[in-house]
């Protein structure tokens, strides 16, 4: 029999030590991975609740198990809040991740072998947009578009040319490392020209969209997916949204369950509901506006210090920095910055001469540092420290100085006060 007073401490101290070390790392490092953020303690409370015990295959009011009357209310709250937040008619809150949400969209609306047109992973797209190593590139005939090498921007004329040539059943708009604003009306026009469905993966910018600071794809897309973490600051999970379309809604629901998943994670759905409520608060827009201001401030410093920011700057929360001119690799930069308490991720740049395990760039995002409370002044300072490390790669004295500066900034701006 379990006790309500059971604790990990004293029972599994080996595991607890690793958990505590990770929490300490989050407090003592400046997190600049664009896809990472910190959740509120409310979100964590929901994920650690008794809802983790409940199986609830099916949908509210149509479950395959009894005893679902309370979790039905939880899921309906999450659905209603998601619809309100994004102005959608339909929301499915059950996908376990963004990738599983994307897989469900393909399963719902495509047949194996159908052609999809998505952004190349090498140019800032995502694995699930047709990369050959992904199921999206194995099950479907994936054609890829990319950036204009001269401007660093999506070449919409090339997207249209590829669409006319290959006649895709679905066009995928979305990215994992693109710092400019997507032209959803142009994507819609291209899709209509060739009779394709338009699928938008807004995982990286969902928080900006919710705040009204980035164009909302809902009016233009046939279906939209997102993660619920990243800029939304919720639990790790997925979400599918759409305008009213009974046929598509039915296909999407069936693709998620029973097509791709079994029982939903009700404790995570509760945490999603909390996250959506937080995002509906007036202060959420202020937070997202600061995310963008911080990103722009950092990009200005990098450009001023002679670093190439792909696409020439940023309109959102992230930037991709090419290190080709400096003769550095992303792997080297990632490791050096990690030694001083700054966490980034190595990332391929367009036409990258290095392998995906080495790369010639780093991706930087501001959602997490903005959650800590950093503003433009601290963001510029931080960008300068990054340049100092990269300008003097491997210099122990520079690393020691920056590590001290990072520790001071972390102490001044704790994640949880």
Swiss-Prot record:
NCBIfam families (alphabetical): PRK00011.1
Keyword annotations: Amino-acid biosynthesis, Cytoplasm, One-carbon metabolism, Pyridoxal phosphate, Transferase
Protein name listed in UniProt: Serine hydroxymethyltransferase 1
Catalytic activity: (6R)-5,10-methylene-5,6,7,8-tetrahydrofolate + glycine + H2O = (6S)-5,6,7,8-tetrahydrofolate + L-serine
Compartments, as annotated in UniProt: Cytoplasm
Cofactor(s), names only, from the UniProt record: pyridoxal 5'-phosphate
Pfam families, sorted: SHMT
GO-annotated cellular components: cytoplasm; cytosol
Enzyme Commission designation: 2.1.2.1
Amino acids binding (6S)-5,6,7,8-tetrahydrofolate: 121, 125-127, 355-357
Subunit structure: Homodimer.
Family: Belongs to the SHMT family.
Class of this enzyme: transferase
Site (Plays an important role in substrate specificity): 229
PANTHER family in the record: SERINE HYDROXYMETHYLTRANSFERASE (PTHR11680:SF50)
Main function: Catalyzes the reversible interconversion of serine and glycine with tetrahydrofolate (THF) serving as the one-carbon carrier. This reaction serves as the major source of one-carbon groups required for the biosynthesis of purines, thymidylate, methionine, and other important biomolecules. Also exhibits THF-independent aldolase activity toward beta-hydroxyamino acids, producing glycine and aldehydes, via a retro-aldol mechanism.
Gene Ontology biological process terms from the UniProt entry: glycine biosynthetic process from serine; tetrahydrofolate interconversion; tetrahydrofolate metabolic process
Gene Ontology molecular function, alphabetical: glycine hydroxymethyltransferase activity; pyridoxal phosphate binding
Domain of life according to the entry: Bacteria
Chain positions found as N6-(pyridoxal phosphate)lysine: 230
HAMAP family: SHMT (MF_00051)
Pathway named in the protein's UniProt entry: One-carbon metabolism; tetrahydrofolate interconversion; Amino-acid biosynthesis; glycine biosynthesis; glycine from L-serine: step 1/1
């Amino acid at each position: 029999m379990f006790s309500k007073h059971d604790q990990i401490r004293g029972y599994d101290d080996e595991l607890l030590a690793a958990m505590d070390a990770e929490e300490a790392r989050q407090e003592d490092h400046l997190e600049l991975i664009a896809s990472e953020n910190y959740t509120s303690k409310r979100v964590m409370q929901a994920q650690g609740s008794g809802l983790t015990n409940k199986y609830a295959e099916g949908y509210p009011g149509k479950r395959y198990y009894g005893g679902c009357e309370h979790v039905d209310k939880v899921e309906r709250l999450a659905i209603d809040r998601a619809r309100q937040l994004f102005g959608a008619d339909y929301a499915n809150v059950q996908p376990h991740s963004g990738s599983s949400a994307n897989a469900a969209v393909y399963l719902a609306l495509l047949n194996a072998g159908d052609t999809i047109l998505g952004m190349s992973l090498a140019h800032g797209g995502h694995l699930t947009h047709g990369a050959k190593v992904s199921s999206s590139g194995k099950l479907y005939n994936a054609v890829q578009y990319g950036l204009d090498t001269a401007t660093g921007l999506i070449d919409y004329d090339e997207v249209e040319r590829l669409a006319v040539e290959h006649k895709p059943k679905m066009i995928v708009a979305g990215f994992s490392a693109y710092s400019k604003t997507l032209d959803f009306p142009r994507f819609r026009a291209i899709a209509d020209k060739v009779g394709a469905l338009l699928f938008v993966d807004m995982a990286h910018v969902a928080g900006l969209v919710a705040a009204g600071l980035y164009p909302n794809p809902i009016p233009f897309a046939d279906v939209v997916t997102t993660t619920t973490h990243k800029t939304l600051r919720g639990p790790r999970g997925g979400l599918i949204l759409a305008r009213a379309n009974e046929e598509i809604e039915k296909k999407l629901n069936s693709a998620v369950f029973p097509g791709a998943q079994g029982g939903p994670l009700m404790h995570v759905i509760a945490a999603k509901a909390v996250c959506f409520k937080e995002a509906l608060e007036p202060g959420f827009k202020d937070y997202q506006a600061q995310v963008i201001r911080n990103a722009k401030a950092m990009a200005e410093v990098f450009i001023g210090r002679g670093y190439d920011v792909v696409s020439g700057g940023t309109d959102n929360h992230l930037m991709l920095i090419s290190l080709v001119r400096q003769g550095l690799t992303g792997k080297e930069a990632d490791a050096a910055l990690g030694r001083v308490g700054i966490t980034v991720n190595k990332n391929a740049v367009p036409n990258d001469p290095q392998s995906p395990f080495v790369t010639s760039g780093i991706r930087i995002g501001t959602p997490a540092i903005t959650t800590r409370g950093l503003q433009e002044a601290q963001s510029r300072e931080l960008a300068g420290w990054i340049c100092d490390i990269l300008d003097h790669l491997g210099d122990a004295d520079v690393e020691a100085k920056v590590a001290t500066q990072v520790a001071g900034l972390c102490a001044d701006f704790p994640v949880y006060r």
